[in-house]
């Protein structure tokens, strides 16, 4: 699960492996299984979830696109040179903030429905993010 992937990322001494684990945790938390076009969708959803102002949304979006590129270069090309301690720490913090927001949502949903499952909460989160991303694209805060 997402928390396990995040925890495993915290335990890594290899920067690239930690980076990959954090990215996987984000994908597992915010994307449907076997989703195509993960990079853009993940960047959109993380920025919608964490950004407050238009500028913050754009900054988080660009950072996530860069992080995903670094992960791909490391995983597919064997080139992890862009992954530094700073980038790893930044992605760790992004992942932690996303997980915290999702846990808060779980607690809120559980208050009104004690039988709700993580899969159901995840679907609610993803549905809300689809709506939010559409609004942000329409306002120009995210690229269309």
What do the PLM-derived regions correspond to, one by one?
Residues 1-144:
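Amphipathic, oligomerization/interface secondary-structure segments
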